[in-house]
């Protein structure tokens, strides 16, 4: 009797689902890319347009995840610690990027931030252009990845005992000192998780970016859009190679963050 036959039905279903929905697609991508490894993999992966697309994608995703990390802390704090009219509506609106099709999100952002839009008209007077620029790419990534940080921080903030803050206050600590010395250290693992999830979501964003950006090489073309352009040109090899590079970078960053989290939890005990 082999090991697989000893597994319970629930384990078999779980492993089967992960195999067909996650593992096999990744292996298929890597297998197809490996066919080009000894011929022109690196020449395709290191094309100037591809390198610039990587830099735009990763830099904008990093900025978006950091921005969401900063504002996510404050928003999660307000939603957990304060009661105010319309709180449930605000809390439900946090999940809007999850439910909204990315193409609709891109159209909405392009409308609002266009030169004649509500926000874009004001920014235009400050000589700031969002639509069809790298800034627009960043705005789209911030929008679609925003909920991850808030939703990962909320349960942690709810579990923090109010008595810890009161004890710090009784010892003369200010509210700001209490937050940084007492509350923030316990938020670090969840914050890193939320930022990592936001980063991963932003790196793979296509639907909203393709609408709000001009998608011109060496300007604001991102890697996911470049992959789709390759597919439109029937360049399946190029699309596979670029996709493999982005996948590898994302996995490397996620593994690194998980290692940092593990070390942080180990030393905090």
UniProtKB/Swiss-Prot annotation:
SUPFAM superfamilies: MetI-like. InterPro entries: CysT_permease, MetI-like, MetI-like_sf, Sulph_transpt2. GO terms for molecular function: ABC-type sulfate transporter activity. The chain crosses the membrane at residues 10-30, 60-80, 92-112, 130-150, 179-199, 208-228, 240-260. CDD domains: TM_PBP2 (cd06261). One of its GO terms (cellular component) is plasma membrane. PROSITE patterns: ABC_TM1. Its main location: plastid. Keywords: Chloroplast, Membrane, Plastid, Sulfate transport, Transmembrane, Transmembrane helix, Transport. It is a multi-pass membrane protein. It is found in: Plastid, Chloroplast membrane. Residues 54-255 form the ABC transmembrane type-1 domain. Belongs to the binding-protein-dependent transport system permease family. CysTW subfamily. Part of the ABC transporter complex cysAWTP (TC 3.A.1.6.1) involved in sulfate/thiosulfate import. Probably responsible for the translocation of the substrate across the membrane. NCBIfam families: 3a0106s02, permease_CysT. This is Probable sulfate transport system permease protein cysT. The lineage of its organism: Eukaryota, Viridiplantae, Streptophyta, Mesostigmatophyceae, Mesostigmatales. The gene is cysT.
């Amino acid at each position: 009797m082999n090991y697989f036959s000893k597994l319970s039905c629930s384990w078999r279903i779980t492993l089967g689902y992960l195999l067909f929905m996650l593992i096999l697609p990744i292996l298929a991508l890597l297998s197809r890319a490996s066919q080009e490894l000894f011929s022109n993999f690196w020449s395709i992966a290191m094309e100037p347009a591809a390198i610039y697309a990587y830099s735009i994608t990763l830099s904008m995703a990093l900025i978006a995840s950091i921005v969401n990390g900063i504002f996510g802390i404050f928003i999660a704090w307000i939603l957990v610690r304060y009661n105010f009219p319309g709180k449930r509506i605000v809390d439900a609106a946090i999940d809007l990027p999850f439910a909204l099709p990315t193409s609709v999100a891109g159209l909405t952002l392009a409308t609002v931030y266009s030169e004649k839009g509500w926000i874009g008209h004001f920014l235009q007077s400050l000589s700031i252009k969002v639509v069809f620029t790298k800034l627009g790419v960043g705005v789209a990534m911030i929008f679609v990845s925003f909920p991850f940080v808030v939703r990962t921080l909320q349960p942690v903030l709810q579990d923090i005992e109010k008595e810890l803050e009161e004890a710090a206050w009784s010892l003369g600590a200010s509210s700001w000192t209490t937050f940084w010395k007492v509350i923030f250290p316990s938020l670090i693992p969840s914050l890193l998780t939320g930022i990592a999830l936001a980063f991963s979501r932003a790196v793979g964003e296509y639907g909203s970016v393709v609408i709000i950006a001009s998608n011109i090489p060496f300007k604001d073309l991102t890697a996911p859009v470049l992959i789709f352009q390759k597919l439109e040109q029937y360049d399946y090899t190029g699309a596979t190679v670029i996709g493999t590079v982005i996948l590898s970078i994302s996995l490397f960053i996620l593994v690194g963050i998980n290692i940092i989290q593990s070390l942080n939890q180990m030393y905090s005990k």
